[in-house]
Amino acid sequence: MTWKLFICFLSFGVIFLRVSSLTEKSHTTSYTILHNNNFYSNSCSADTYVPSIKTFSSVWAILNVIIFFCASLFYLRHLCIVKFISNLTK
């Protein structure tokens, strides 16, 4: 059991190092900042926003949403089963 845990932590470490090296490279490259002057206008809406999956924070946020959604489903499933069993045993 411990060697499986070791391999799991090792693989997460390798993935983390790859992600951190990708983000470090992006800091050294030059880029231009595009300012959107229409951000506060009425024409700006959520339809014009394009999410990016290239950053670690975006991937982390998506992963957190998926985990929260699955946990909510499991909790609601548990509540339904408990209520069903309590109704059966009355």
Swiss-Prot record:
Keywords: Disulfide bond, Host Golgi apparatus, Host membrane, Membrane, Signal, Transmembrane, Transmembrane helix, Viral envelope protein, Virion
Predominant cellular place of this UniProt entry's protein: virion
Pfam families: Herpes_UL73 (PF03554)
First and last residue of the signal peptide: 1-21
Membrane topology: Single-pass type I membrane protein
Intravirion topological segments: 77-90
InterPro entries, alphabetized: Herpes_glycoprotein_N_domain, HSV_GN
Subunit structure: Interacts (via N-terminus) with gM (via N-terminus). The gM-gN heterodimer forms the gCII complex.
Family named by the database record: Belongs to the herpesviridae glycoprotein N family.
Function: Envelope glycoprotein necessary for proper maturation of gM and modulation of its membrane fusion activity. Also plays a critical role in virion morphogenesis.
Protein name: Envelope glycoprotein N
Natural source organism: Saimiriine herpesvirus 2 (strain 11)
Lineage: Viruses, Duplodnaviria, Heunggongvirae, Peploviricota, Herviviricetes
